[in-house]
Regions:
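Long, low-complexity, serine/proline/glycine-rich intrinsically disordered regulatory regions
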Residues: 1-19
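Alpha-helical adaptor scaffolds
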Residues: 13-21, 27-37, 45-49
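HEAT-repeat alpha-solenoid elements in large eukaryotic scaffold proteins
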Residues: 2-6, 34-41
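C-terminal catalytic region of ATP-dependent kinase domains
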Residues: 38-41, 45-146, 314-454
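Conserved ATP-binding subdomain of kinase catalytic cores across diverse folds
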Residues: 38, 42, 159-302, 314-329
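Juxta-kinase regulatory segment immediately upstream of eukaryotic protein kinase catalytic domains
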Residues: 128-172
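Hydrophobic residue at the +6 position relative to the catalytic HRD Asp in the kinase catalytic loop
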Residues: 310-312
Length: 454
């Protein structure tokens, strides 16, 4: 009685307003301490029940973080939900493990036990085996020799048998082996994970914190969800702890460096790998993935964008990898907001082509869509401060970076002109950028010559 509805226009709602809570809404509520109120917590739990599993898994770091502040969200929300689905259970259990600190260890251990108690016996058994697998990965990272690493990989399956991957419970592996050690800064290990059906999944076991890479893949997922016609190629990232982690290797890819030095153009490489597809289809893929990669790099402030950190898949999609430098940081002190190489422009038909013009327009349209969700990109990035705990990435620095990138006070036309100028500047290949690409490659080659495999 006495209830009535007002349209969003009269309430001055944003264009992103919806009748139910979105992921973006929950982040805003959690960051402003509105979750202290019991009715708000109930609304959040109701929203969680409506979200798809992929979105829940992508946001699990934030959900666990908020639940640690308001533990009733664990008891009445996350634990009952996760205990019914194996993928959610694995994501939640390992995220609790990852967020343990001296202050939170007791709470999160209690939550893990509660989650296991509510789950079925089969799910508990599968989780236990996967926990042993994660420990095996950690032991392989610390192993002093390749013989020891091989022994650990072989012994695991003798003791435990087939096991589900912690980042994808639908994949069950029966064997794994360490193939080689790469000659890059952290000397990552290349591993092959073999399934019973004969499929093989290659991963990098990295001796460095990969939580920022996971943040990047989460942001890439949301770029795909909130824009039209652009595409960010994402891959699995699983932090083992704050010192090492696993990154999925994308099959059938080459770095732009490899293509450039094979005396083959990017367009020729793509066409020779897709003989049954038209040039237009291939160029559309290049345009969509280049726009997505550029917008992700622009949003995060990616640095260290040399030719070995940009890949192209055999089916014509460009992919950024290695997200160690963000918020404008760069080991060589470059101030490049996004990287567009001559090879990419050539694959689109040249700087004056209609395809390149459509790329610029697509980037502008997608950027306009992303500006509607400016606070969302801030909240995703600020996990570097509140969840990862990187003191160099203070929330005020991330706030200023986000405001600089999305200029929420400007009109649509002014912002569109700004992103167009950023794209145009990114297409200018400078002599310094060429020099950086050459020195990076030479450095890796020398590392490979002088590093001895132990």
């Amino acid at each position: 009685a006495g209830q009535y509805q007002l349209p969003c226009r009269k309430l001055l709602c944003s264009r992103a307003c919806r009748p139910t809570l979105s992921v973006e809404d929950i982040l805003r509520l959690g960051m402003t301490n509105c979750l202290e109120e019991s009715p708000v917590q109930r609304w959040v739990i109701e929203a969680w029940r409506l979200f798809d599993n992929i979105s829940m898994i992508k946001m699990m770091p934030w959900w666990v973080h908020f639940c640690c502040k308001f533990e009733t969200l664990f008891k009445h929300g996350l634990v009952p939900l996760a205990s019914q689905r194996m993928d959610l259970m694995f994501a939640m259990w390992f995220e609790c493990d990852l967020q343990k600190t001296p202050r939170l260890t007791h709470t999160l251990q209690r939550v893990q036990k509660s989650l296991e108690a509510d789950a079925s016996a089969e799910m508990r058994s599968e989780l236990l085996k996967t926990r042993h697998l994660v420990q095996c990965f950690k032991n392989i990272v610390r192993a002093p020799s390749k013989e020891r690493r091989a022994g650990l990989a072989t012994a695991f399956f003798k003791d435990h048998g087939p096991v589900r991957l912690p980042w994808n419970v639908d994949i069950v592996i029966v064997r794994m082996c360490v193939i080689k050690q790469l000659a890059s800064s952290s000397n990552p290990l290349v591993m092959e994970l073999h399934c019973k059906n004969g499929a093989c999944h290659s991963v990098l076991l990295k001796r460095e914190d990969v939580r920022t890479d996971r943040t990047a893949m989460g942001m890439g997922y949301w770029v795909n969800q909130l824009t039209s016609d652009v595409y960010v190629h994402t891959y699995d990232v699983f932090p083992l702890n704050d010192q090492c982690g696993i990154v999925q290797m994308i099959p059938q890819t080459k770095t732009l460096y490899e293509i450039r030095h094979s005396k083959e153009s990017l367009l020729n490489y793509i066409m020779s790998s897709n003989e049954t597809l038209s040039v237009k289809t291939l160029r559309d893929r290049v345009v969509a993935s280049t726009a997505g990669a550029c917008l992700l790099a622009f949003t995060m402030g990616l640095g260290d964008r040399h030719l070995e950190n940009i890949l192209v898949s055999s089916d014509a999609f460009l992919v950024h990898v290695d997200f160690g430098y963000v918020l404008g940081d760069d080991p060589k002190r470059q101030r490049t907001q996004m990287r567009i190489t001559e090879d990419m422009i050539d694959a689109m038909g040249g700087h004056q082509s209609a395809t390149f013009a459509s790329f610029v327009r697509l980037t502008q349209l997608a950027y306009g869509s992303m500006r509607i969700h400016t606070s969302f990109w801030y909240h995703l990035l600020v996990s570097e401060c509140f969840i990862v705990g990187d003191k160099s990435r203070h929330w005020k620095r991330i706030r200023d970076h986000t405001l600089d990138r999305f200029v929420p006070g400007e009109g649509h036309d002014e912002a569109s002109v700004q992103i167009e100028s950023v794209v145009e500047k990114a297409t200018e290949e400078t002599w310094f950028q060429t020099f950086v690409d050459m020195t990076h490659s030479a450095s890796n080659q020398m590392t490979g010559i002088f590093r001895m495999e132990l």
